[in-house]
């Protein structure tokens, strides 16, 4: 059987339903309890072999619907997808050089783990291209080496991440939840947001999982879930981008069941009652003038999948 000439993997964005941030640990990372929720906003990563490159070496290209976001994607070795290919190549016998093409729909530097999702997709795509047959458990270990948020897009759905966020345990979810994501101009540096968090909260307690949130997910109760959404990084994101406070308030005024900054921001997430309510909420947010654009999505959805 001939090896494939290219492989495309579709990978979802995430929203953090709970991001509890503890003190800095001895390894320099913050302890986290992070409830990840995969939503139907997807990047597509396509890999194809390049015989003129060393095994694991990658060249990158990117396109997408939003040129301002595409322009912010690094095309050098700092790109997590390129690092994923290089890492996997050290662990499979028939690695080649690769061209990695990313079609972006997940906001860049928006707090929805777009770069991490692309890295997860690159692991799956390169393993299929190189016929590595790497077990999913091993891919999860490699993903954790790349970054705290890279493992979750491999499994998708809804999961709690502990440690620095990479130790995953799936959570039961009943039904489907509907979301609006409000996009704003510019990004926010995760490093700067965590630094501001440390300044604002130097004596952070150990992070915990919220039983009310877990129960709301298991019951499929959107109203209870909306009331349980929390993000410890939100005050830091608002300190760096105060205008996000107006955006969150606009969503609440328009009837969102819950509103929060997604991850380190600046994208903001709003929970709706239904798909119709999500469309109405998105229109109200655009009309408010507090965001550049909106997208609607639902979750949970599966993780990185070959298409």
Swiss-Prot record:
It is an enzyme of class 2 (transferase). The keyword Amino-acid biosynthesis does not apply. GO terms for biological process: isopentenyl diphosphate biosynthetic process, methylerythritol 4-phosphate pathway; terpenoid biosynthetic process. Coiled coil: none annotated. One of its GO terms (molecular function) is ATP binding. Transmembrane segments: none annotated. It catalyses: 4-CDP-2-C-methyl-D-erythritol + ATP = 4-CDP-2-C-methyl-D-erythritol 2-phosphate + ADP + H(+). It comes from the Bacteria. Pathway: Isoprenoid biosynthesis; isopentenyl diphosphate biosynthesis via DXP pathway; isopentenyl diphosphate from 1-deoxy-D-xylulose 5-phosphate: step 3/6. It holds the Pfam family GHMP_kinases_C. InterPro entries: GHMP_kinase_C_dom (IPR013750), GHMP_kinase_C_sf (IPR036554), GHMP_kinase_N_dom (IPR006204), IspE (IPR004424), Ribosomal_Su5_D2-typ_SF (IPR020568), Ribsml_uS5_D2-typ_fold_subgr (IPR014721). Its EC number is 2.7.1.148. ATP binds at residues 107-117. The active site is at 14, 149. The keyword NADP does not apply. Keywords: ATP-binding, Isoprene biosynthesis, Kinase, Nucleotide-binding, Transferase. Catalyzes the phosphorylation of the position 2 hydroxy group of 4-diphosphocytidyl-2C-methyl-D-erythritol. HAMAP family: IspE. Belongs to the GHMP kinase family. IspE subfamily. PANTHER family: 4-DIPHOSPHOCYTIDYL-2-C-METHYL-D-ERYTHRITOL KINASE, CHLOROPLASTIC. This is 4-diphosphocytidyl-2-C-methyl-D-erythritol kinase. It comes from Thermobifida fusca (strain YX). The gene is ispE.
